[in-house]
Regions:
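Catalytic alpha/beta core domains of metabolic enzymes, predominantly
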Residues: 108-190
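Active-site beta->alpha loop and helix N-cap motifs at the rims of alpha/beta catalytic domains
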Residues: 2, 8-15, 19-102, 106, ...
Length: 190
């Protein structure tokens, strides 16, 4: 079954959707936090984490390897349900394999975000172990916005990650309800 995660940061909405059995987790990011009025990222994130026992992905905002690792270690301590959200590449286009490997080897649950290709999924799979939980968030909506069909990339990413019982593929950047049906048909995890 394809699970539904809410990509929100508004405290009232987190409370509301946490009560819904249909919702199985939450993802956030610094932009959503700012829009929700967060002044202190850590404090606001911890408030969200207190509301729910469901998985919550909180993103690092550093752009370099050293600081991403430091932030990831701090964020992981905010709660047992926390996934540290790390971009697959930084703003310079560099693959963040060292960050992924370092945090994953510390048994820190990860949500690798802004993934666009099956090649990136392969790189991620090479960087992780087969025990610590990892979500790979593939940006379907943004791909479709540029005229690219995300379906083949999802099929390939799901196929190559099948041997990794600790990995879940997330249909990210959802644009319309039909995207859920597409994800479900592909047996996308989230």
């Amino acid at each position: 079954m394809t699970k539904i995660f809410c990509d929100i940061a508004d405290i009232k909405l987190v409370r509301k959707f946490d009560k819904k059995k249909l919702v199985k987790g939450f993802t956030t990011n610094p932009s959503l936090m700012r829009r929700a009025g967060a002044k202190d990222y850590a404090k606001y994130s911890k408030e969200i984490i207190k509301i729910t026992r469901k998985p919550v992905s909180c993103e690092v905002f550093a752009d370099d390897i050293k600081n991403m690792i430091l932030q990831g270690k701090k964020i992981s301590k905010w709660g047992k349900n926390v996934y540290v959200k790390v971009p697959v590449i930084n703003s310079k286009g560099k693959f963040m394999g060292k960050v992924i490997k370092s945090l994953n080897n510390r048994k820190i649950k990860l949500n690798i975000t802004a993934v666009y290709t099956a090649k990136q999924t392969k790189q991620i799979l090479k960087a992780i172990n087969r025990k610590t939980k990892v979500i790979i968030s593939i940006f379907a909506g943004r791909m479709a916005d540029t005229g690219n069909d995300p379906i083949p990339r999802f099929k390939e990413s799901i196929r190559i990650s099948k041997k990794y019982k600790n990995v879940q593929i997330l249909w990210a950047s959802t644009r319309e309800p039909y995207n859920y049906l597409q994800a479900k048909k592909l047996r996308c995890h989230i």
